[in-house]
C-alpha cells in the first residue's frame, strides 16, 4: 500500500486529515527529522517547503531542488517497522525499476536515498488533483471526457508492463493530473510502494492498510496470490467504474467484505449506473473485471479499445463482454 497521499500532487487534492505545513528550510521518518535526514543523504540539495500529506508509512513534501532550481515532490518512507534486513535492498531495487520508467503518463523519478531505517524518493511535482479528489468533489466524469484521459493512464500502465514492472495499487488516488485542467496529462504515481509496504506489514497491519485500496484489488490480490500485469488491469477496470460512475464496483465500509466481493461477486454493469454509456465501453469495463486473469484485456488492448470508443462510440467495440460461466465453473 502507499501512504494516504500519492507520490506527488497539489495540497488541494489531499483526502486525508493531515494539514500540517512547514516553510522552514531543511531541519524522514518523523516530521522533526525529515529535513535533517534528507539533507544528510542529499548533501543539502533538497529544501523542504511544505508537507502536503502523511500516511501510515511516510509523508509527502513539496520541496525545492537547490541544484537545478526546480520544484519537486519528496516522499519519505519509514522502513523501521520491518524486521527484514533485506528491506533496504528491496527499496533500492524498486527505486531503480521505477526510475527506469520513462513515459509521459508516469510520474518522473529524479532521485532516491535510504539509510536502512528511512528512505526518500524525489520526483516531479504535479500541480493538479488526483482522480479520487475530482470524483469526490465534482462527481463522476462524463464518459466522453473520461475516455481519452483513461486511454492515457492505460498507456502508462502498458509501458510499465512491457518493462516487467507491476504497479500493484492502481486506484484513482494514484492518478494525478499535471495541472488543474481535466484535459491536462494524467500521471500514474506510487509504483512499487504498495509492494514495499505489504512486505513490511504484519497480518493485522496489512488488513488495516487495505481499507484505502480493497475497492481496487484484483481477486488474486485479495486472495493473497502472486500478482502480475493482469492484476493491474482488473484494478484499472475498477478505477474506470469509479471515474465513470462516482463509486467503485463494490462499495462498502469493511475492507474484508469488499475484498470478498472482489473474489466472489459479479461486478455491476456500467450501463446500470450510466445508461447513456456506449455498449463498447460497458463491455470493456466488464472484460477488465473478469475474475480470470488470463481473460482480461492487456493494457495495449485497452488503449486500442478506448481510442476506438473515443473515435466512434457507436461502432462495435474491440473487446467482447465476458462469457457467463457455465455449469460447474
What positions do the PLM features span?
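Activation segment of protein kinases
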Residues: 82-86, 178-226, 253
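Protein kinase catalytic-loop region centered on the HRD/HxD motif
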Residues: 154-165
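Protein kinase glycine-rich loop
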Residues: 48-55, 60
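AlphaC helix of the eukaryotic protein kinase fold
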Residues: 76-100
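Activation-segment/catalytic-loop signature of the eukaryotic protein kinase fold
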Residues: 112
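Conserved short submotifs of the Hanks-type protein kinase catalytic core
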Residues: 116-130, 134
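Activation segment signature within eukaryotic-like protein kinase domains
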Residues: 149-150
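C-terminal lobe helix-coil module of Hanks-type protein kinase domains
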Residues: 215-315
Amino acid at each position: 500500500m502507499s501512504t494516504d497521499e500519492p507520490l506527488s500532487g497539489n495540497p488541494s487534492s489531499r483526502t486525508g486529515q493531515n494539514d500540517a505545513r512547514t516553510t522552514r528550510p531543511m531541519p524522514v521518518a518523523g516530521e522533526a527529522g525529515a529535513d535533517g535526514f534528507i539533507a544528510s543523504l542529499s548533501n543539502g540539495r533538497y529544501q523542504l517547503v511544505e508537507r502536503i500529506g502523511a500516511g501510515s508509512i511516510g509523508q509527502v513534501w513539496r520541496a525545492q531542488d537547490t541544484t537545478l532550481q526546480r520544484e519537486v515532490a519528496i516522499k519519505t518512507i519509514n522502513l523501521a517497522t520491518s524486521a527484514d534486513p533485506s528491506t533496504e535492498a528491496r527499496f533500492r531495487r524498486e527505486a531503480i525499476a521505477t526510475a527506469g520508467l520513462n513515459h509521459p503518463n508516469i510520474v518522473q523519478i529524479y532521485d532516491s536515498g535510504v539509510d536502512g531505517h528511512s528512505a526518500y524518493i524525489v520526483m516531479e511535482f504535479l500541480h493538479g488533483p488526483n482522480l479520487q479528489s475530482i470524483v469526490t468533489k465534482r462527481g463522476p466524469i462524463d464518459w466522453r471526457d473520461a475516455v481519452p484521459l483513461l486511454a492515457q493512464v492505460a498507456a502508462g500502465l502498458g509501458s510499465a508492463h512491457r518493462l516487467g514492472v507491476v504497479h500493484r495499487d492502481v486506484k484513482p488516488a494514484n492518478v494525478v493530473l499535471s495541472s488543474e485542467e481535466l484535459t491536462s496529462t494524467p500521471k500514474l504515481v506510487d509504483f512499487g510502494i504498495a509492494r514495499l509496504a505489504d512486505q513490511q506489514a504484519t497480518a493485522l497491519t496489512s488488513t488495516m492498510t487495505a481499507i484505502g485500496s480493497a475497492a481496487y484489488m484484483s481477486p488474486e490480490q485479495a486472495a493473497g496470490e502472486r500478482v502480475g500485469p493482469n492484476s493491474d488491469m482488473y484494478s484499472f477496470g475498477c478505477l474506470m467504474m469509479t471515474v465513470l460512475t462516482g463509486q467503485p464496483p463494490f462499495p462498502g465500509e469493511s475492507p474484508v467484505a469488499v475484498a470478498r466481493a472482489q473474489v466472489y461477486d459479479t461486478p455491476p454493469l456500467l450501463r446500470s449506473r450510466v445508461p447513456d454509456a456506449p455498449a463498447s465501453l460497458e463491455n470493456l469495463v466488464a472484460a477488465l473485471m473478469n475474475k480470470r486473469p488470463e481473460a482480461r484485456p492487456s493494457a495495449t488492448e485497452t488503449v486500442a479499445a478506448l481510442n476506438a470508443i473515443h473515435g466512434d462510440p457507436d461502432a462495435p467495440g474491440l473487446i467482447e463482454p465476458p462469457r457467463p460461466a457455465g455449469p460447474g465453473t
